[in-house]
Amino acid sequence: MLQNMKCVLGLFMLCLLACTENKYAGIPEKYHALLDQALVKAGDNATELTAALKNAPDNQKEGMAFLIAYMPERDLKELTADFLLENTAYAYQAREKYVWAREIPDTVFLNDVLPYVSLNETREGWRKEFYERFGKYVQHCKTIFEAIDSVNRNVRDEVLVDYNTKREKPDQSPFESMRQHMASCTGLSILLTDAFRAVGIPSRVAGTPNWHDERGNHNWTEVWADGNWYFTEFYFPGQLNNAWFFADAGKAVKNDQQKAIYASSFKPTGTYFPLVWDENIRYVPAANVTDFYTDLYKSHLETISADGNHVPLRIMMFTDNACVQNSEDRVAANLDIFCGDSVLYGVPASDPDS
């Protein structure tokens, strides 16, 4: 009797194991438990997600599993199989077509090319259209840097969107911005990030909830190339790591949640991207990348200090024209230094390091 019970139990375990393996056939085991949890959270929409996993081609199954395993709960309950299958298909198509995309590590591709979203924007099927729109700008590019340059230089004229405070909302999706022909810095950054991703260039949105001198938030775009991240913006500054906000970013405060700099992630990181338009949203993962900007800016200052073409400048603001040089008569004021229309520096005059 005992021997028979052991046989029955053994057969049951084998059947259970077979069912589990068949359920996630072709998907790495590291995703299985995560997918189980995701499908429970999905509720009635689990059938759509299961269909997406089942119908994804073998070479795209890990990508589909990655998206479903790590997507926020709102997406688990709403996204359709067709939406996910199209997004994944065109992401892998770009990876197969472009030489730089084929060289991207899997971890970078999954987290910074494959995702259909950057922040909390409306979920849209932008990838197919953007693959076609921006493919023409990179078809003759031989390196990822050439491709980045080409997309960045042409994105504005391709989508006909400009910065405008009259836009409907700050966190617009690509098509919402294109319909209005206007967007916030966040909307522009999402547009550019999606344009890069559509042609196999890893990209993410970066930004700060508040500049070091209390001037408010700003968001921009980062791109990955040859093992490193670089920053740029919708209005191409001419070269990477050289946008108008560089000086401000260089003064960010890592341990101040409101004045640190964050870069978006699809996979959870233990940190969230602070969204100033809805501070209750905590489901957008992020990395605190403040050190990258402050270290880069420090190196930049050391370089220009040694080149013989720059001189130190000290500016103080006073309460009246008596200009008494003591701390009681100094006042705090924001200081912006321009060269034409470009902001070279932006610091508070009361900053002891300015």
Report each predicted region and the residues it spans.
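Bacterial N-terminal signal peptides that target proteins for export
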Residues: 1-9
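Hydrophobic helical h-region of N-terminal Sec-dependent signal peptides
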Residues: 10-14
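C-terminal motif of bacterial Sec signal peptides marking the signal peptidase cleavage site
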Residues: 17-18
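Loop/turn elements at helix/coil->beta-strand transitions in domains of secreted/extracellular proteins
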Residues: 144-147, 198-204, 226-228
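Cysteine-centered nucleophilic/redox motifs
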Residues: 151, 181-206, 221
